[in-house]
Amino acid sequence: MLRNLLLLLLPLLIEAKLPPFFLGRLNGKTLLNHHLDRLTASDGASIQETYPNLQVHNFTQKLDHFDPYNTKTWNQKYFYNPVFSRNNSIIFLMIGGEGPENGKWAANPNVQYLQWAKEFGADVFDLEHRFFGDSWPIPDMQTSSLRYLTTQQALADLAFFIEFMNQQYGFKNPRWVTFGGSYPGSLAAWFRQKYPQLTVGSVASSAPVNLKLDFYEYAMVVEDDLRITDPKCAQATKDAFVQMQKLALTAEGRNSLNNHFNLQPPFDANTTKLDINNFFGNIFNTYQGMTQYTYDGQSNSTHSDKTVRKMCDIMTNATETDVVMRVENLFLWFNQMEPASANLTVMPNSYWDVISQVGSGDLNVLGPDGAAARGWMWLCCNEIGFLQTTNQGNNVFGTGVPLNLFIDMCTDMFGDSMKMSQIMGGNKKSQNYYGGADFYNATNVVLPNGSLDPWHALGTYGTIKSQSLLPYLINGTAHCGDMYPSYDGEPGSLLAARAFVKENVRQFIRYDPNVDGPGGSSSSASLFVVAYIVCGFLFV
């Protein structure tokens, strides 16, 4: 049960005490927007000052696409970039995800798909996800209101948006291609399943389509990455976690952990198993954050510094004989780039602080970061799962992050209507609806994944060339690595991967430079037909 007193905490406390990395995402931002903020750091100029041709609009969206008697509407935010348009009805749509959209994915000409937009003469849109950023179907996040925050409603939002834009901008024989990375990549993949008539293709980067509730495979891939980088790194990590778990068993040992990590609040005589699990979750977050970003093109730090290699250098530093001290050094180093609090030496250590911050349905109490974290947690608890545990048996991280930690979070954040049976039922229903990885079936979709990315374990890898269902595993890259600008010294596999994606986008839109290029006439573009295969799925 939530502690009512803690729900009165100010938004300032929310931003100060949420862990920087929460269920595979940076707090307050989608993974993509976090990366692009680093890539395009400026002197504080607004997005429209930096990109004056970028337009920001709202349009009238339906509240409930599946209840014909519900006529309520709301304003959904989108960005429109006409700079590359040659009026040939080629349209690229970036799908917004689990945080605010800031417009950079519609405007920054250096990201890969905007380079293709320039070459192909595409109009570009970026649609913000319902219940994130400035797009509020209902002006609160009470559990009763969040019934409208589902993947099916989000996909229907996309469909209604495309139909509306076709009319508003007068697109003739439109050739829409959707793009998304991470959770929006899942939406891009599922949109090709459920609404194939509205687009000619999708690029679903790092898209988890297998809706695992207990996502222990995440930790397995992190461990594999450590072993690939340096077998001694994996062993040092295991030794450290074994030692920390031993320390957690006694009052003296817990006091040692207090001193190592400057835990606030510290472990004391009232420490519970839940507190211990929460601590190990915070330690595991550091490994998650390092691995998920490794070698991507977001900034100089991820090119060569904020990498698995650097993490392993710290964990195998022979001059430091105390393996727990190595983990402390890793936390302090990571915390400089992703601060957990204003004091870079402090590790926030209160399970109930997180619950109080994300458990409120009041937007004024939540603040921007708390609202985004609550929305993401709802999606995970209510249907998509992705709960990142260390439940995989014998492993380097031990058993400190069990599924029950997240089940408790779901119940404590959303109430008694969100208990184990409801969580499992909602997850199974969505898995059956979309088919999971084994039964994913669509036409004209490219699904790139990075081999080092823990999320690739939930991808689909069954190629069907006849219907252009095209998974692509990129060796030596991590989360959404294919989407960023190229850089000197990047993994060599990215060059071929980007060329593969681009060529298939070209085929999806049936690009003809004689018609679609400069001086081409959109009126002479031929109407084409794409064959679609639609699968039926079992509803539970």
UniProtKB/Swiss-Prot annotation:
Keywords: Glycoprotein, Hydrolase, Protease, Serine protease, Signal. Gene3D superfamilies: alpha/beta hydrolase (3.40.50.1820), Serine carboxypeptidase S28, SKS domain (1.20.120.980). Residues 1-16 form the signal peptide. The keyword Glycoprotein applies. The keyword Protease applies. The active site is at 182 (charge relay system), 453 (charge relay system), 479 (charge relay system). GO terms for molecular function: dipeptidyl-peptidase activity; serine-type exopeptidase activity. InterPro entries: AB_hydrolase_fold, Peptidase_S28, Ser_carbopepase_S28_SKS. GO terms for cellular component: membrane raft. GO terms for biological process: innate immune response; proteolysis. It comes from the Eukaryota. Its EC number is 3.4.-.-. SUPFAM superfamilies: alpha/beta-Hydrolases. Glycans are attached at residues 58, 87, 270, 300, 317, 343, 441, 449, 475. Pfam families: Peptidase_S28. Belongs to the peptidase S28 family. This is Putative serine protease F56F10.1. It comes from Caenorhabditis elegans.
